A protein has these predicted regions:
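Small/polar-residue-rich loop-to-helix segments that shape phosphate-bearing ligand pockets
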Residues: 116-184, 226-250
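Active-site-proximal loop->helix
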Residues: 73-74, 97-140, 203, 220-226
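Positively charged, low-complexity intrinsically disordered leader regions
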Residues: 34-83
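Internal active-site segments that recognize and position negatively charged phosphoryl groups
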Residues: 175-181, 188-199
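Short, well-ordered alpha-helical microsegments
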Residues: 93-97, 120, 195-199, 256-262, ...
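Acidic, low-complexity, intrinsically disordered interaction modules
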Residues: 3-20
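A short, small-residue-rich loop immediately preceding and capping a beta-strand
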Residues: 82-102, 106-114, 187-194
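Active-site/ligand-binding loops adjacent to catalytic centers
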Residues: 207-266, 286-302
Length: 302
C-alpha cells in the first residue's frame, strides 16, 4: 500500500547548484547557458506576469506548462534523424503533455514509459489522448523505469531519451534565457521535485533569494542550489486543501501547495513561478479503454 505521509524532510542543503560547473562563478554560468541558447527564441513568448495579492506570478497556466519552454530549446536543437522523444511519465506531472506539445511543433513522435496501475491517471490519459506511444511497466521505483526507458532509446538510432524532470543543459539554457527577460525579483518561490526549474532560475537571477517547496522527495547533493527548502508534509499524490489554493489555475498536487507559504502584500518584490494548470481531457472513455495493469515479470532483473 501507499504511504500517504512520506517523510521528505531530510534534504541535503549544501548550497551547491549542480548545473553550475565547479570552476564557474554564477555570472560565468549565466553567460555559458545564454551562449548555449543564443540561436533559440522562445516560441511561447515572454511569460505573462500577473500580480495577485501583492505577489508577481508567472502565469504559465496560460500555456501547456513551463516545461515547453526549456523543452523547445532542447528538442529544436536535436539532429534531423532523431524522430522520437523518450520520457518516463509518472502519474503526476506536466512533462508528458509539454513534451507532446513541443514534439508536435517539430514533427517528432513521443514514446512515454509509465508505471503500471489498476487505472491510468488524469495526466497519463491526457498524454495518450494527445497521441503518445506508450508502454506500462510494473516497477518498485521510478529510477527502475528510467533505466528501462533509457535502454529502449539506446537501442534505437532515431530515439532520444530525456531524463526525469527534463534534466538537460539545453533545457536549463532555455529556462535561463526566458527568465533573464523578466526583471529580477527580490525573492522567488516555486514548487520543486527534481529542482531543474529552481536551479535554472537561480542562474538567471543571481541576487534573488529562493525558497523551494519540496513536494515530491528528498533533495540530493547539488539539487537545491542556494534555495531554502520547505518540506511539504502532504504526499506528492495528495491534493492541497481548497482553501489554500491560489486564485488562478494550478496543479493542486504541485504549485497549489506553495501559495500558503508565500507572504502576501508584503513590501518585498516576491515572484511565484506557476508552472501550469490541469490539462484538459476530452474523451473520458480512455480511462476504461486503456489496460495499464501489468503483473511483475518473473525473475526480471530490476
Amino acid at each position: 500500500g501507499e504511504n500517504h505521509h512520506l517523510a521528505h524532510n531530510k534534504h541535503i542543503i549544501d548550497g551547491i547548484n549542480k548545473d553550475v560547473g565547479p570552476l564557474y562563478t554564477h555570472e560565468e554560468a549565466k553567460d555559458y547557458y545564454l551562449e548555449l541558447a543564443k540561436d533559440w527564441e522562445d516560441p511561447y513568448g515572454i511569460p505573462q506576469i500577473v500580480e495577485h495579492e501583492g505577489v508577481r506570478v508567472v502565469r504559465d497556466d496560460f500555456i501547456t506548462g513551463s516545461k515547453v519552454r526549456g523543452g523547445d530549446c532542447l528538442i529544436s536543437s536535436l539532429p534531423e534523424h532523431i524522430d522520437t522523444i523518450v520520457y518516463v511519465q509518472p502519474r503526476t506531472g506536466l512533462a508528458g503533455v509539454s513534451i507532446l506539445d513541443v514534439a508536435k511543433r517539430h514533427n517528432k513522435k513521443v514514446m512515454l514509459f509509465m508505471p503500471s496501475s489498476k487505472r491510468i491517471s488524469h495526466h497519463q490519459a491526457c498524454c495518450i489522448e494527445r497521441g503518445c506511444d506508450y508502454e506500462f511497466h510494473r516497477i518498485a521505483a521510478m529510477p527502475n523505469l528510467n533505466l528501462i526507458a533509457k535502454k529502449w532509446a539506446d537501442q534505437r538510432k532515431n530515439a532520444f531519451f530525456v531524463p526525469l524532470g527534463l534534466k538537460h543543459e539545453k533545457v536549463t539554457a532555455g529556462i535561463v534565457k526566458t527568465a533573464s527577460r523578466i526583471p529580477e525579483p527580490e525573492e522567488v518561490y516555486c514548487a520543486t521535485s527534481t529542482g531543474v526549474l529552481t536551479r535554472g532560475l537561480q542562474i538567471a537571477w543571481p541576487n534573488a533569494k529562493f525558497t523551494s517547496v519540496c513536494v515530491a522527495r528528498n533533495m540530493k547533493d547539488g539539487e537545491l542550489g542556494r534555495a531554502t527548502p520547505i518540506s511539504e508534509p502532504l504526499a506528492f499524490t495528495s491534493s492541497e486543501k481548497k482553501e489554500n489554493l491560489p486564485p488562478f489555475p494550478n496543479i493542486d498536487t504541485y504549485d497549489g501547495k506553495v501559495w500558503k507559504y508565500i507572504p502576501k502584500n508584503s513590501d518585498k518584490d516576491i515572484l511565484f513561478w506557476n508552472v501550469g494548470k490541469e490539462p484538459e481531457l476530452h474523451d473520458e472513455t480512455i480511462y476504461d479503454r486503456i489496460d495499464s495493469y501489468r503483473d511483475w515479470k518473473k525473475n526480471a532483473a530490476n
